[in-house]
Amino acid sequence: MKTKTPATRQGTRTRTAGPADPPTRARRDAAATRAALLAAAVAEFARHGYAGARVDEIAKLAGINKQLVYHYYGSKEDLYQAALESVYTELREKERSLSLGELQPAEAMVKLIGFSFDYLSTHPEFISMLTDENRNQGQHITGAKPLRAMHRPFVEMLEATLERGVAAGTFRADYDAINLYISIAGISYFFFSNNHTLSAIFGKRLHTKAALAQRRRHVIEFTMNSLLVDPARKT
């Protein structure tokens, strides 16, 4: 006697998982939307400043509905602060990736100075946003705890590099990390933020590759000559 196999219900099929379940896909879409919004916000705020930037233009650049801007970031001010944090975060992450602790102190410092110059050269939006924020007395960055927290690891890395250099007899002992970094950043920042006026005043095209290379060498040599115990010994 044959045993009958129970018939399967007509129309039922075994569910095959798709590339991503709806909740996962939604999370990915939300992350992509937020990233597009931040990129558009950085571009708009860098171009027009906080006061001149328009939320509807940011939405247009991001390719989304204007209401989604408020859904994800609440207000123009919140979006601006997020954009400001994002440009700082990118810089700090790239600085940490330099792995200065793996290099000899002088070599590490040369690498950091060169990186700082190159970063400003290729990120004019960073310069524009910082200039605008300082024009507004730093009102959006003051008290921003995430920004303070992200700076601490970099300062500690710079302090460790200085201490190693002092211990090796390479660096002067009267430099502190924060003042040194302000000098490194300030020398390059002034050059790029005032490049057009400096070019006009001195009658030189300071934005050419040759001019940038010459300035980069000068910034490194100028800083290292003040930091080294024996400037003749670069590494």
Predicted regions and their residues:
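Short, basic, alpha-helical segments at the C-terminal edge of helix-turn-helix-like DNA-binding modules
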Residues: E85-E90
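Hydrophobic alpha-helical connector segments
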Residues: R96-S128, R148-H151, V155, A177-Y181, ...
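Amphipathic alpha-helical segments used for helix-helix packing
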Residues: A108, S121-K145, N195-F202
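Helix-turn-helix
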Residues: K2, A36, A40, E44-D78, ...
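C-terminal peripheral helix-coil segments that are non-catalytic and often amphipathic
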Residues: M1-D21, F115-D118, T122, R152-A168, ...
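Short coil/turn segments at alpha/beta junctions that flank glycine-rich nucleotide-binding fingerprints
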Residues: R47-A51, E102, H123, A168
